[in-house]
Design a protein with these regions (language model features):
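Conserved beta-strand positions in the central sheet of alpha/beta enzyme cores
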Residues: 5, 35, 60, 88, ...
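Acidic-and-aromatic substrate-binding clefts and catalytic sites of carbohydrate-active enzymes
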Residues: 12-17, 33-46, 63-71, 94-103, ...
Length: 265
């Protein structure tokens, strides 16, 4: 079984008030891993020590976020302090709007990838729903991959449905060779999403989500078809219809008690 982690963006409102306390609660639930998206005014070295003290680890981070070749020096330095060999990139809907946009985005990504590779880092792409829209019947993400064939993917299974238009298991199979980890959220896949914006450098797409196992995402089928290359299953609930800490604990219990992921308890 793959280890289970939680994307700390899910707990951002609590982290703003008591970041060390949030990390302790995550460890107490039994999560093996965390994936940060911001360090809440904690130095990278201090954050790394906090994880070590709590017996937590991470295989990836959404901090720092690779946005251009010009920022990669700082990005690599932070990743090194965090003891990571992977760096994340991701985009706005406008970056995938047209064929020309996709090509330009892929070319920029390939440039960053080349620099990172020379320095011992792997670049991975985190998706939302819009990459799984189609142009002339072809997935935009497939077009992106053609122009940037070396890129690795952190597949967000819920978003890969493109709001209920695609089969997430089929999407996983299509990109199985590129997948390095999985983001798992749950909810009613077919819903409208509006109000997209950037908040503290992170793409925010308001969506109604639920604890894992209570929505319409075929989680058991996804885990059964997960490629060996996936290092971890990371729970991420951008929003939730119930208290977030409760949802994170319920999601952990669902995954571990059903033998879908490995935790510490």
């Amino acid at each position: 079984m793959k280890p289970i982690g939680v994307q700390l963006y899910s707990l951002r409102n609590l982290a703003e008030k008591d970041f060390p306390g949030v990390l302790k609660k995550v460890a107490d639930i039994g999560y093996k891993l965390v994936e940060p998206a911001g360090l809440w005014n904690v130095r990278p070295s201090e954050f790394r020590k906090m994880l070590d003290d709590l017996g937590l680890d991470m295989v990836s981070s959404h901090t720092p976020w690779a946005r251009s070749s010009a920022s990669l020096g700082e990005v690599m330095e932070i990743a090194h302090i965090l003891k990571l060999d992977k760096v994340v990139c991701g985009y706005m809907p406008a970056n995938f709007a047209t064929l020309d946009d996709i090509k330009r985005t892929a070319e920029d990504t390939a440039k960053m990838q080349e620099i990172l590779e020379r320095n011992g880092f792997t670049l991975f792409q985190h998706n939302h729903d819009f990459e799984f829209a189609r142009i002339d019947g072809k997935l935009k993400y497939e077009i992106f991959r053609e122009y940037c064939p070396k890129v690795k993917i952190q597949l967000d299974c819920f978003w890969s449905t493109n709001l209920g238009k695609e089969d997430p298991v089929e999407m996983m199979k299509i990109f199985s060779k590129e997948i390095i980890s999985i983001h798992m959220k749950d909810g009613i896949c077919k819903q409208d999403v509006s109000g997209t914006k950037m908040v503290n450098g992170i793409l925010e797409r308001p969506v109604d989500l639920m604890p894992l196992g209570t929505g319409s995402l075929p989680i058991k089928d996804l885990v059964a078809n997960m490629p060996e290359s996936a290092e971890a299953i990371i729970v991420e609930l951008d929003y939730c219809i119930i208290d977030m800490l409760t949802a994170i604990e319920q999601s952990y219990t669902y995954m571990v008690s059903n033998g879908l992921a490995a935790g510490n308890k």
